[in-house]
Amino acid sequence: MSAASASAAVKQKVEAPVHPMDARIDELTDYIMKNCLWQFHSRSWDRERQNAEILKKTKELLCGEPVDLSTSHDRCYWVDAVCLADDYREHYPWINSMSKEELASLMQGLKDRMDYLTITGSLNEELSDKHY
């Protein structure tokens, strides 16, 4: 590894978030990483918005809460959230027995993990390229 690469790696080092439901968050994260293309936006601000909006709407769906569909962006995120919530209910049956508070905590932990993996912990320099 060159000195410049090592310097960039040290500069970008961010600690992974720790959460009491880490094992379950790992399962949900693994599903997203293998099945969801929305995680691959080329700019960090796109990834931040996607993670926040899709996972917020997924939480609302899992908790049986109303979902804002007032804008075209909201509806776009909602479509991904519906697919994700349905898949989580099918593939991870334990999610169906969680309380709203547990689901909210789980989904916040998942969002924090996704932000770390796709944005703050990523060494992809294109994420912060202003000309990209």
From Swiss-Prot:
Keywords assigned: ATP-binding, Iron, Iron-sulfur, Metal-binding, Nitrogen fixation, Nucleotide-binding, Oxidoreductase
GO biological process terms, semicolon-separated: nitrogen fixation
Catalysed reactions, semicolon-separated: N2 + 8 reduced [2Fe-2S]-[ferredoxin] + 16 ATP + 16 H2O = H2 + 8 oxidized [2Fe-2S]-[ferredoxin] + 2 NH4(+) + 16 ADP + 16 phosphate + 6 H(+)
Top-level taxon: Bacteria
Molecular function in Gene Ontology: ATP binding; iron ion binding; iron-sulfur cluster binding; nitrogenase activity
Entry cofactors: iron-sulfur cluster
Pfam family, one: AnfG_VnfG
Protein's job: The key enzymatic reactions in nitrogen fixation are catalyzed by the nitrogenase complex, which has 2 components: the iron protein (component 2) and a component 1 which is either a molybdenum-iron protein, a vanadium-iron, or an iron-iron protein.
Binding partners and assembly: Hexamer of two alpha, two beta, and two delta chains.
Record protein name field: Nitrogenase iron-iron protein delta chain
